[in-house]
Amino acid sequence: MTRSLKKNPFVANHLLKKIEKLNTKAEKEIIVTWSRASTIIPTMIGHTIAIHNGKEHLPIYITDSMVGHKLGEFAPTLNFRGHAKSDNRSRR
C-alpha cells in the first residue's frame, strides 16, 4: 500500500540536514546512513549515499531515475548463493 498523497514523503531529519548542508556548500562527499526507509527526493540527485544493508554500508550514487524510491531498495540485504549441489551421499 502506498503512502497517502496528503502526506509528504518520509526523509529522516538528520539525512535531510546533511544533504541541505552539502548543497549550500556545493560539495560532494559520501553520506553514511542507516535510514533505509527514507524516500529519495530531487535534492539528493548527484550525491553518493552509503546505505547500510545489515552488515556494511554500500555506496549508491543517486540519479534522477531513483527519485520517489526508498534508499533501502538499492542496498540488498539477502545474499542468495544458490542451492546445495545434488549429491547422492547427502541423501543417506
Curated annotation (Swiss-Prot):
SS bonds (residue pairs): none
Gene Ontology BP term (one): translation
Keyword line: Chloroplast, Plastid, Ribonucleoprotein, Ribosomal protein, RNA-binding, rRNA-binding
A Gene Ontology term for the protein's cellular component: chloroplast
Protein location: Plastid, Chloroplast
InterPro entries xrefs: Ribosomal_uS19 (IPR002222), Ribosomal_uS19_bac-type (IPR005732), Ribosomal_uS19_CS (IPR020934), Ribosomal_uS19_SF (IPR023575)
Main subcellular localisation: plastid
Chloroplast found in the keyword field: yes
Molecular function in Gene Ontology: rRNA binding; structural constituent of ribosome
Pfam families referenced in this protein's UniProt entry, alphabetically: Ribosomal_S19
UniProt family annotation: Belongs to the universal ribosomal protein uS19 family.
HAMAP family documented for this protein: Ribosomal_uS19
Entry function: Protein S19 forms a complex with S13 that binds strongly to the 16S ribosomal RNA.
Protein name: Small ribosomal subunit protein uS19c
The species this protein was found in: Nicotiana tomentosiformis
Phylogenetic lineage: Eukaryota, Viridiplantae, Streptophyta, Embryophyta, Tracheophyta
